[in-house]
């Protein structure tokens, strides 16, 4: 369905260009169709810089993997799970199942970061659109460690 690549484009590019700052970088990006793929020039660079898995919901083109991004999380070769961090961005239902897969692999909630920016409207804490429980997504986030952010799912 949707894509969370826009909010993490900068961090992916940064670590792709500074490989000495990470031991290994895995990136899984999902798009609805090949026509919906964003940042094609970046993707060409990222293919050379990291382990990149690109998925689309369905396609006849053999280059693309098909299906949900969560299908490919168990394939990641994470050498030391306790020294690994994950950033999960996208539709809430995808984030829920992606986090579940990461937890099954042995990651701790504190190692997983989620983004809730889809909830924001004014960005100033005035309209209340982004308020979930006592948290204003626009003021307190939008990025949360999963141990804190798990209470912010609908």
Residue ranges of predicted features:
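Local cysteine-cluster metal-coordination motifs and their immediate loop/turn environment
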Residues: 93, 117-142
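FNR/FR-type flavoprotein reductase catalytic core
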Residues: 1-120
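Short Fe-S-cluster ligation motifs
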Residues: 41, 128, 139, 144, ...
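Short amphipathic alpha-helical patches
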Residues: 69, 96, 125-126, 150-154
């Amino acid at each position: 369905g949707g894509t969370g690549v826009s909010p993490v484009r900068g961090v992916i590019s940064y670590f792709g260009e500074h490989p000495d700052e990470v031991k290994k970088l895995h990136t899984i990006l999902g798009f609805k169709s090949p026509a919906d793929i964003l940042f094609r020039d970046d993707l060409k660079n990222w293919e050379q810089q990291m382990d990149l898995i690109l998925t689309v919901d369905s396609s006849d083109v053999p280059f693309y993997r098909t299906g949900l991004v969560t299908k490919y999380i168990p394939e990641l070769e994470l050498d030391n799970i306790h020294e690994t961090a994950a950033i999960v961005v996208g539709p809430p239902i995808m984030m829920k199942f992606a986090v579940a897969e990461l937890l099954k692999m042995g990651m701790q909630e504190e190692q997983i970061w989620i983004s809730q920016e889809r909830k924001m409207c004014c960005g100033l804490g005035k309209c209340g659109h982004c308020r979930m429980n006592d948290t204003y997504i626009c003021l307190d986030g939008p990025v949360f460690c999963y141990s804190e952010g798990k209470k912010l799912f609908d």
